[in-house]
Amino acid sequence: MGSNPTPSASVLYMDLSFILKRVKGITLNSKEVKKGYLFFAIKGTRFDGHNFIREAEERGAYAVVVERPVSSKVPVIIVEDTRKALGKSAHEFFGKPSERLNVIGITGTNGKTTTTHLIEKILLEAGEKTGLIGTIYYRLGEKILGSGRTTPDQITWHRTLKEFYELGAKNVVAEISSHALDQYRVYPTRFEAVLFTNLSQDHLDYHKTMEDYFASKAKLFTEYESKVKIINADDTYGKRLLKITHGEIITYGKKGDLKILNFRTDFRGSALRIAFKGKEYEFSTNLIGDFQAYNLSAAIAYALWKGIEPDLIQRALKCVNVPGRFEVVHSDKFTVIIDYAHTPDAVENVLRTARKLSKGKLISVFGAGGNRDREKRPLMGKAAEKYSDLIILTSDNPRDEEPEKIIEDILDGISEKDKVIIEADRRKAIKKAIDMAKEGDMVAILGKGHEDYQEIKGVKYPFSDAQVVKEILGGDGCIGKD
């Protein structure tokens, strides 16, 4: 971009397009400001960027974008919403990349990661280079471009889309979190398709109420352009979404446009029979779990809408690996399941399937994240009690909270306290579960899935459930990468 000298300080109300042609970069982090950069003052949950304008000036900011009048030595551009202004500016600064790509956005409480991987696999099978943005990583083929938040900030989002485009991608499939929608992190992306999986309790530490949570999710369907909207018609909030969204809509579920006729699952995988536009199709996959019926249906609905042949869809679904999602570890006598389930609904879904597949007892090991929604903790305990013969409560990512206090919150939802063992050390808890497992039993380790760290008091220590299980089982364990 241009290298014009910084103009004299003034308060401006103008189209940011004029300024964007004259700056070298844009940022919302005052510590990243360089000479000639445009700084956006964002008011966050912990910090207010308006308090860091002086630092941005000292680092050479060309101008600052704010929501309220401030004293500054550089031009001040006042806008109604700096988050939206940042999104629009990043979109323009990086060449409007979403207009050159087919961007598929997926939102919902559970199923986002699996559904993004399914759609990515289908598009790759169709010969279309496809990027993925999500909880585990941001990647294009084998190239990992980054990781962090499920959905990155506005600058990272639009810059990543640009990188995908420059690397030859035709499509990008992305998880869109409720936080991202509330904070306009993907604004003003033009989507090819947007998908809704489901909504159940999570993130109430941030959204406060389920109504606020739903309102954030709904933004993807009411405030963004998309060619098609694909919605779970069996979900209560999905039905509500149908009443407020417009344009081309495809529903999926037992009563959807894409109708689930039959689904069966066991340790060999799953089979799904559906009806869509007067035709019946059957698909099989290595993925396990009753909940996969909806993840598969969402991905198939998109693929059929796009005109991808059913035979090609089947080839893609035959073997899918989603790290930390119902990951099966086989030993000589029993089975271990590793899953990211960290909401009441996800815990119930995973343990219901585990109960169904287990020939013996079901031992569950889990905790809950610190500094997050406390209300869901007893509900997770209640869900675990419903299906488990034995529950070992332990730490997840306690963050700044004491693990014992989190465990107490979970314990409040469990009535049969005699089926509970408390072991705050997660490694010891996993070992205890494996040591107690007998032939035919199943051990379900929930909450962290693919994560390779445990966050305690601001420090992320190396920790992987899969690695710990492998170390404990030694040569007896085989982690399936189905």
Curated annotation (Swiss-Prot):
- Provide one Gene Ontology biological process annotation: peptidoglycan biosynthetic process
Q: Does the keyword Isomerase apply?
A: no
Which pathway does it operate in?
Cell wall biogenesis; peptidoglycan biosynthesis
Where is it localised? Cytoplasm
Q: Which GO terms describe its molecular function?
A: ATP binding; magnesium ion binding; tetrahydrofolylpolyglutamate synthase activity; UDP-N-acetylmuramoylalanyl-D-glutamate-2,6-diaminopimelate ligase activity
Q: Name one Pfam family in it.
A: Mur_ligase_C
EC class of the enzyme, as a word: ligase
Co-factor(s): Mg(2+)
Q: Kindly state which reaction or reactions the protein catalyses.
A: UDP-N-acetyl-alpha-D-muramoyl-L-alanyl-D-glutamate + meso-2,6-diaminopimelate + ATP = UDP-N-acetyl-alpha-D-muramoyl-L-alanyl-gamma-D-glutamyl-meso-2,6-diaminopimelate + ADP + phosphate + H(+)
Q: Which residues bind meso-2,6-diaminopimelate?
A: 372, 396-399, 447, 451
> Which residues does the annotation say bind UDP-N-acetyl-alpha-D-muramoyl-L-alanyl-D-glutamate?
28, 30, 150-151, 177, 183, 185
Binding-site list for ATP = 108-114
What EC number is given for this enzyme?
Answer: 6.3.2.13
Q: How is it modified after translation?
A: Carboxylation is probably crucial for Mg(2+) binding and, consequently, for the gamma-phosphate positioning of ATP.
| GO cellular component terms attached to this protein's record | cytoplasm
Q: Which UniProt keywords apply?
A: ATP-binding, Cell cycle, Cell division, Cell shape, Cell wall biogenesis/degradation, Cytoplasm, Ligase, Magnesium, Nucleotide-binding, Peptidoglycan synthesis
Matching HAMAP family = MurE
Role, per record: Catalyzes the addition of meso-diaminopimelic acid to the nucleotide precursor UDP-N-acetylmuramoyl-L-alanyl-D-glutamate (UMAG) in the biosynthesis of bacterial cell-wall peptidoglycan.
Q: Which family does it belong to?
A: Belongs to the MurCDEF family. MurE subfamily.
Q: Which PANTHER family match?
A: MUR LIGASE FAMILY MEMBER (PTHR23135), UDP-N-ACETYLMURAMOYL-L-ALANYL-D-GLUTAMATE--2,6-DIAMINOPIMELATE LIGASE MURE HOMOLOG, CHLOROPLASTIC (PTHR23135:SF4)
| Listed name of the protein | UDP-N-acetylmuramoyl-L-alanyl-D-glutamate--2,6-diaminopimelate ligase
Q: Which organism is it from?
A: Aquifex aeolicus (strain VF5)
